[in-house]
């Protein structure tokens, strides 16, 4: 439950208990009620009493959208409020940091911070929070830390930097709570060493409670359990328990060639075959810009979300997408390539443990060479397939199939949330079609069929099914020559120019105008991220679809207006008489040349 607008599906709700029965502070209960939460979810009804009454460390494994955020925020807030009541003599304006929340990405840090602000609305005088995950000058950070926030939200890397360079500004002697959210993703991002170093600064031997929240439980998490936890309570909420809610997600896969991916996208979005907002996932930043530029050729607007863009711009794009400003978002999900493991070992892990998904990555040298050409710095603390709260997504389109079954689960988890229906469509390139069209080729598609079989196997364990889907080729073929023209105009040079142009525009909006937008928030709404880049030549005629290409039922009925003469056939008698008189008068006149003397 990441915001007040998005409530957990009914399948997650625990009707047998209410928030009032959890003995929470009245101010916290008032904030919970204000945000529309009536009953806790399953994970909340189990975790909150264990944390508050029994003071247990907690390791929780639960699916996306089950209310994990509030499951740890409520105990943290309640514990701090209780501490303030019982230790009024220690509070002299120099309060200590009482809670630390670690998350893998900046986007998730901002999301948690937003939820926290809503929960401490009526106790903001007693609890202050600070999100240090965003880039800010050290002088600004130091001044913010002088306010002594009770809760600090950060990525492990940012917190480690703070402790190394400015540890005197943070007092951790009375730390009560440590939360590590999305633990498996934190470890995938390579923060294991940072966590070990952070542990040296924490009062682990005192009464420090730890929350480890994760989608999977693997050996790495077991190591963190030994390092951070003492006799923890382990909560597991399997997908089987909420499978009745999963039938709201319909999954399709389409076997197609590499070039036909672009053709199908053109047809789908130009003819409006998908109603509602669509989230498109690609595996590479260049792929995202190529798809955007190709769609621009046909007048289809979209916006880009990737790790190159400034953090402020990324957050603004997500916010506007959630407010329905954009309906088509192309997101680059390249975080799955950070951690590389042997595929065979992953297969063994899958057979030995049903709780742990396979983690496999592409070791293709060609893909690495392609990445070598990009000199623009990426933000390693960026993740889009997990954590980011995309609201009311009608369809998730895997333009590029993810390289792991685990990543597939997280991608499709962006739709069919909060009890709503959703559709997931995945393009799969058969091995026999791989490499036939060099300009549209991407190396990871070589393994699409293998990945698809693993995805189908994984989903079948959950009682879910991926259905094959095929388009009417006769209807699609009519659009092919137009796609060939549009695709030909999007060259590699055009893609590079588009990346540079987009980055310059977003940096300008993010840095130079940041203060202006803070003073004039109404003008921020007019800042758009789906403007046409078109460094490539845009052919205007491609933006309109001729009627003869449309299916019969989609063609606009033409009105039969009949023959339209240049002059009106019907004339009044008055006009006829006037014409006759004029002709007589003009005819009676003599020719001046003949009568000239």
From Swiss-Prot:
Pfam families: DEAD (PF00270), Helicase_C (PF00271). Residues 340-354 have a biased composition (Acidic residues). Residues 340-373, 521-540, 561-597 are annotated as: Disordered. It is found in: Nucleus, Nucleolus. Its EC number is 3.6.4.13. GO terms for biological process: rRNA processing. ATP binds at residues 62-69. Residues 355-367, 526-535 have a biased composition (Basic and acidic residues). It catalyses: ATP + H2O = ADP + phosphate + H(+). InterPro entries: DEAD/DEAH_box_helicase_dom, DEAD_box_RNA_helicase, Helicase_ATP-bd, Helicase_C-like, P-loop_NTPase, RNA_helicase_DEAD_Q_motif. Coiled coil: none annotated. Keywords: ATP-binding, Helicase, Hydrolase, Nucleotide-binding, Nucleus, Ribosome biogenesis, RNA-binding, rRNA processing. Gene3D superfamilies: P-loop containing nucleotide triphosphate hydrolases. Residues 568-587 have a biased composition (Basic residues). One of its GO terms (molecular function) is RNA helicase activity. A motif (Q motif) lies at residues 17-45. A motif (DEAD box) lies at residues 181-184. Belongs to the DEAD box helicase family. DDX56/DBP9 subfamily. The Q motif is unique to and characteristic of the DEAD box family of RNA helicases and controls ATP binding and hydrolysis. This is ATP-dependent RNA helicase DBP9. It comes from Vanderwaltozyma polyspora (strain ATCC 22028 / DSM 70294 / BCRC 21397 / CBS 2163 / NBRC 10782 / NRRL Y-8283 / UCD 57-17) (Kluyveromyces polysporus). The gene is DBP9.
């Amino acid at each position: 439950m990441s915001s007040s607008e998005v409530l957990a599906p009914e399948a997650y709700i625990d009707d047998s208990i209410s928030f009032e029965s959890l003995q929470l502070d009245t101010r916290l209960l008032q904030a919970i009620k204000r945000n529309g939460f009536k009953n806790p979810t399953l994970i909340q009804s189990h975790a909150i009493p264990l944390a508050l009454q029994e003071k247990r460390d907690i390791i929780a494994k639960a699916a996306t959208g089950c209310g994990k955020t509030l499951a740890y925020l409520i105990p943290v807030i309640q514990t701090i409020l209780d501490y303030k009541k019982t230790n009024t003599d220690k509070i002299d304006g120099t309060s200590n940091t009482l809670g630390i929340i670690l998350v893998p990405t900046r986007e998730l840090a901002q999301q948690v911070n937003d939820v926290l602000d809503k929960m401490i609305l009526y106790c903001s005088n007693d609890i202050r929070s600070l999100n240090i995950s965003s880039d800010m000058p050290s002088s600004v950070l130091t001044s913010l830390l002088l306010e002594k926030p009770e809760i600090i939200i950060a990525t492990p890397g940012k917190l480690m930097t703070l402790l190394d360079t400015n540890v005197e500004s943070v007092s951790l002697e009375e730390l009560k709570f440590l939360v590590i959210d999305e633990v498996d993703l934190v470890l995938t991002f390579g923060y294991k060493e940072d966590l070990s170093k952070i542990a040296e600064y924490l009062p682990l031997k005192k009464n420090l409670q730890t929350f480890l929240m994760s989608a999977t439980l693997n050996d790495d998490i077991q190591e963190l359990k030994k390092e951070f936890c003492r006799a923890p309570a382990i909560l597991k909420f399997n997908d089987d328990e909420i499978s009745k809610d999963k039938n709201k997600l319909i999954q399709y896969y389409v076997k197609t060639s590499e070039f036909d991916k672009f053709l199908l996208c053109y047809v789908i979005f130009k003819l409006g075959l998908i109603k509602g907002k669509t989230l498109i996932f690609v595996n590479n930043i260049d792929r995202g810009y190529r798809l955007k530029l190709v769609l621009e050729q046909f007048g289809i607007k979209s916006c880009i979300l990737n790790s190159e863009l400034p953090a402020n711009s990324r957050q603004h794009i997500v916010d506007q997408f959630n407010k329905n400003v954009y309906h088509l978002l192309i997101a680059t999900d390249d975080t799955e390539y950070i951690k590389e493991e042997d595929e065979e070992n992953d297969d063994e892990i899958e057979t030995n443990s049903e709780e742990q998904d396979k983690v496999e990555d592409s070791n293709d040298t060609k893909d690495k060479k392609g990445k070598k050409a990009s000199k623009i710095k990426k933000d390693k603390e960026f993740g889009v397939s997990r954590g980011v709260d995309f609201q009311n997504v009608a369809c998730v389109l895997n333009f590029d199939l993810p390289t792991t079954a685990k990543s597939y689960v997280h991608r499709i988890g962006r739709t069919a949330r909060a009890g709503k229906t959703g559709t997931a469509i995945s393009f799969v390139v058969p091995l026999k079609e791989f490499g036939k069209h060099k300009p549209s080729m991407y190396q990871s598609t070589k393994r699409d069929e293998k990945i698809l079989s693993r995805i189908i196997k994984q989903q079948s364990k959950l009682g879910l099914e991926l259905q094959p889907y095929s388009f009417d080729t006769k209807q699609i073929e009519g659009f092919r020559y137009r796609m060939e023209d549009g695709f030909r105009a999007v060259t590699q040079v055009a893609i590079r120019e588009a990346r540079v142009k987009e980055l310059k525009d977003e940096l300008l909006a993010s840095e130079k105008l940041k203060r202006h937008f803070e003073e004039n928030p109404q003008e921020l709404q007019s800042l758009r991220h789906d403007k046409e880049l078109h460094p490539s030549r845009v052919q205007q005629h491609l933006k309109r679809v001729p009627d003869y290409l449309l299916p019969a039922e989609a063609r606009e009925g033409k009105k039969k207006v009949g023959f339209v003469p240049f002059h009106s056939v019907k004339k009044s008698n008055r006009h006829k008489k006037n014409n006759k008189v004029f002709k007589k008068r003009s005819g009676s006149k003599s020719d001046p040349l003949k009568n000239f003397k």
